[in-house]
C-alpha cells in the first residue's frame, strides 16, 4: 500500500476537524475495459496521520485509530471511480459510530509517483444546447479532475452531471462510445447526481 504526503499548513485554523471521506477508489471501484469491480479488494480502508510541528520543532501526531467517529449517512450516497457519484444534499453525516481498527500485514511505503496537484482551472466552457433538450458544457479537451458548480432548486429536485467525450450523429450527448452495453439511462458510467 502506498501513502501520499501533503503539506496542509495553509488549511490549519485555531480549531480544526480531521475529516476523511473514504470511497472505493482504485482499490475496489470498477476498473479497466471490462468494468470489473473489487479487483484488489472488497473493503476500502484508510490509515492517516496529521503531523503538527510547532515553532520549537516539537511534533504532535493525530492519527487514525478506534476513537475516530464513523458515519455511513453523509450526503455522498454512492461513489465509484468509474461509475460516478450520487450526492443527496438533504443528508448530513451524524458520526454515531466509531471506526473499526483492522490489522494490515503488508508493506506501507511512500508513493513513488508525482504528487497529485491542481494544474489548472478550466472555466467558461462552450455551452451546447442539444436537440434532445440536454445542455453540454464543452471544455474542448479530455480532462481529469473535479467539477465545481452552483445550482439552485427545490428539495428533492435532481441534477445529473454526466461526463463524456462526444456528441452522436444527431448532435446529442452520448457516452455509448465508452460503455460496454446499454445506454446512459441505465448505466451509471461517470455520472454525478445531485439531489
Which residues are covered by each model-predicted region?
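Extracellular/oxidizing-compartment recognition motifs
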Residues: 1-195
